[in-house]
Amino acid sequence: RAKGLLVGTEAGVEYHQTFRDKGMDRPLPVAFYDPTNPAARDYVWNKLKNNYFDLGVRVFWLDACEPELNPGHPSNLRFYAGKGLNVSNLYPRENARMIWEGMREQGEDEFLTLCRSAWAGQAKYGAAVWSGDIGPTWEALYTQVRAGQSIGIAGIPWWTSDIGGFHGGDASDPAYQELFARWFEFGAFCPLMRVHGHREPREDVASENPGGPNEIWSYGEEVADICSRYILLRETLRPYLTRVMDEASECGIPAMRALFLEFPEDGRCWSWDGEFLLGPDLLVSPITEAGSRTARVYLPRGARWRQLLIAPSRGDEDQEATASYMLGETFEGGSELTIDAPLECIPLFIRENTDLD
């Protein structure tokens, strides 16, 4: 405070927000450091270095880095960089910059920072974004398919969601097990794949109770088997994913792509937003409705597409098999198909002659 490193207000005092953490019997006022101030970034990084980096920590998860001002009145805020109404959206970017500058100063060249918020230009600081504390619902899963495409178009190529949603979800409930399986299948083809959530039975996030179990085996044998197969498939795709991530890093092209980015001449791709491409060649059509066992899929015009099937425990001798997937029938682009989508299968297609190895 005495160094002037905190977010201020037009009245000249620092901004305060009430917050309740574990071990507190009541909410207490907290202030926010001002990441637009280079001296503030240095101050916070030195705290992180002494307490985490020097003990071996190399990956940081930056929660609530908007910051979480409630209520937030940007016009009342004052930053080192200027008036809040003009610069407050820079907060998450400059916060990620704080980590980046500190890590680079320590000689670290390859690292990832996971953030809850982002602003234009943040990706250059090695920052990925997740979509925050979303509900464990089919509606939330539906919106994540669109959110991932939207943030990529906005210039943030590294994105993920909390598989299964964050606030709730009972691992013993068959209805939620279905949702978790479908979300896991979708998550396997997001730029980053991660499970996170505050499952039932749970208490307030400020309590000592971490919530219910949330490992893939917490959801029963069938779901655990499905998740294991998609983890294996994700690992099998590592060479392809590396090429896609390199392109995103070097060119800014998102890993998770709306169809029209690859097929701008196909008018249907501009409105068909329930599918996306992971990189240029892998088409993904997530199931986002409870009980659905078929899917309506559109294959963009200008390419031929071969169905990619998740492998069962033993490969089918009539199909080309790998450890994790099989290649099925080939279809012409411009086709709209209804295909089977049992619980263990997310509709997947690859461009003909694509090398996933």
Task: Show which residues each predicted segment covers.
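Edge strands and adjacent loops of beta-rich recognition modules
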Residues: 269, 356-357
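Catalytic-domain carbohydrate-binding cleft regions of carbohydrate-active enzymes
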Residues: 1-346, 350-351
